[in-house]
Amino acid sequence: MSVDTELYFSSIRKVLGAVNVRKKLDDYDHVTDNGILAQLLEDNGYSFDDEVSAAVQAVFVEGLRQHIRSAGPFPAIDGAVQFVEHICECNDRRVAIATGGWRKSAVLKLESAGFNIEDIPLVSSDDSPSRVEIMRSALAKIGDDFESVTYFGDAKWDQRACKTLGWRFVAVGPDLGGIESYAGIDP
């Protein structure tokens, strides 16, 4: 289990106490921070509540900050920061971030890894619990008149969402046998 996932479920338990959690993230209908939380609350006899979501998010973000202070920044894949910077400079390409995380936690992790995302539209689970809707909204923020859309993701739920949307999927990281270094890759 990743540090991120451990901190996420630890934050839920700090706010709600002992709760039942499904065995795998893939067991949730929407593998996003708000999607998992909504289903976890329902599984444990609670109704989704914005105040509970805000409380869990605050504890989670503070846990991420503590992790960064003690362990250092979240690492970027070699060359990823430069790759994104280069794409942002291209006239024929657009960049948006679609994340299943909450906005505050996503920004914190990305900035700690060295990404400058100030001018990049970001859509998160604050906007929708559905990954497909998050991805559609991110595309809408940059215009949807493209010949093709390529999505870089690190999990099978990203891959499934791309299949649903008809987008090209590029696996990132070891879990899907994807890109482990952007060094030398021409966008």
Would you name each region that the model predicts?
Residues T5-Y8, K14, S47-V52, V59-G63:
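N-terminal glycine/serine-rich phosphate-binding loop of ATP-dependent small-molecule kinases
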Residues T5-F9, D33-N34, A38, Q57, ...:
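An amphipathic alpha-helix signature
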